[in-house]
Amino acid sequence: MAEAAVASTVTLPVTGGWTKHVTCRYFMHGLCKEGDNCRYSHDLTSSKPAAMMCKFFQKGNCVFGERCRFEHCKPTKSEEVSNPQMLLLSSTPPPIDPECSESGPRLKTQDWANAAEFVPGQPYCGRAESVDVEISIPLIEELNGDATTDKEELRKQLCPYAAVGECRYGVNCAYLHGDVCDMCGLQVLHPTDSSQRSEHTKACIEAHEKDMEISFAIQRSKDMMCGVCMEVVFEKANPSERRFGILSNCSHCYCLKCIRKWRSAKQFESKIIKSCPECRITSNFVIPSEYWVEDKEDKQKLIQKYKDGMGRKPCRYFDEGRGICPFGANCFYKHAFPDGRLEEAQPQRRQTGSSSRNRNSRRTQLWDIIDERESTGSLDNDDEEMVTFELSEMLLMLLAAGNDEEVTDSEDEWDLFHEELDDFYEIYL
């Protein structure tokens, strides 16, 4: 009994301290929560832990950076080349003795009773099927062939970096560096693809023509002087005022601010302020433009572009078919239903009746429309002149709709319209 007690006292320290010879794997990564109370060893000098490489760093997308607890090191080239082959070879069964392999096909048709006898120390050949060692060699060659094919495909594609500037890889780039385009000076022309070369050349020529048009427009506009303020429009201190006001029926130059101020004057008659300050030719509206336009054909294109731009905006009075637009077919805005259908133009019907009560009621409708416009907010500067022209046409239409006489175009009617419109809406006529 005494000997057993002594033996037990001797063996206790051994059973309790063997863990101190094992390095704590949590401490190796800095994650041990036990600290000094840990049963395992925290001494790294006696242990050589295997380096755990960060697989995300090898793929180039480790978000922890320097704070990552795994090792950031790129695999060597020998590892990159050998790893696929090692995985491929390890997945194939080991080579078998030819004598054993010969019996493999026969085992498919023979009974298990005739299987080869198991001999300790030698590979068992009873259930093993014949494996052709030559199969693994074409697989490796196929792997290398796929890599070669990928490189060949990359060599057929233009380098995206060289196409927009400079490629830092130079001659070592895996992509193809195209020929330099004479128009844009970039390496974007494929050496062998003729269709790509022709398409890019065509696109370059179109872009060059647009740039030339802008250059000519700037050259034509840089010295133009406003006929009211006598300042060069392109040299105005406020950049927002460097815009031209193109009159629809006149070729005199004015800045947009001055011509709108001229057309908003109240001390002159409407025909005077609607006319050009120099030649007195009447223009229905003013078109804002960044560049000066004088040629008649270019001016028509500008007017059409201006109307097309307004035609893409939905009419607030039509309201996708829920409302009624007082301008009807003469409205420059878009009359479209929710499903995309456009409103069909309706023929105008002439109403009879010459009583002053009917005429006054139609005038009241006009001022109600102006009040509604004023309550919803002011228009954009680009829309003011066109809306003014629309309102003037509607006024004449309403004045003429109440009788069978000729259309009234007196100065009193027009001045009344002009004064009320300025008071309610502050639009430049």
From Swiss-Prot:
It catalyses: S-ubiquitinyl-[E2 ubiquitin-conjugating enzyme]-L-cysteine + [acceptor protein]-L-lysine = [E2 ubiquitin-conjugating enzyme]-L-cysteine + N(6)-ubiquitinyl-[acceptor protein]-L-lysine. GO terms for molecular function: ubiquitin protein ligase activity; zinc ion binding. One of its GO terms (biological process) is protein polyubiquitination. Its EC number is 2.3.2.27. It is an enzyme of class 2 (transferase). Keywords: Metal-binding, Repeat, Transferase, Ubl conjugation pathway, Zinc, Zinc-finger. The keyword Metal-binding applies. SMART domains: RING, ZnF_C3H1. Disulfide bonds: none annotated. Residues 348-358 have a biased composition (Low complexity). PANTHER family: E3 UBIQUITIN-PROTEIN LIGASE MAKORIN-1 (PTHR11224:SF37), MAKORIN-RELATED (PTHR11224). E3 ubiquitin ligase catalyzing the covalent attachment of ubiquitin moieties onto substrate proteins. This is Probable E3 ubiquitin-protein ligase makorin-1. It comes from Takifugu rubripes (Japanese pufferfish). The lineage of its organism: Eukaryota, Metazoa, Chordata, Craniata, Vertebrata.
